[in-house]
């Protein structure tokens, strides 16, 4: 069961990616995630936002943070995994997707965008 949902929309400008990273960091910290996981989340969400910036013409980037007892689920709309070659001439987007997949516990792409999940580790074990 989802505990809290935070929705964030930012202008489609690179200047606001740091705000998204800071927001994600604050949310992750409030969930008692360790510093390594917080840094992984910050890098991943930054890469997801860069993907949106380079891809579409929407006026804003929409994010949803779903806070659960054992995980943080982050949804970023309009992130794409596979781009037609005529629209993408660089390897940077591919690298960004690989970074996200390596840092987050679960990553799923769908027609709306990307879903990234980081689980809270139980330190009592």
Regions found by a protein language model. Give the residues of each.
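Conserved beta-strand-loop-beta-strand hairpin that lines the nucleotide-binding pocket
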Residues: 1-6, 51-125
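Bergerat-fold GHKL ATPase/HATPase_c domain
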Residues: 1-43
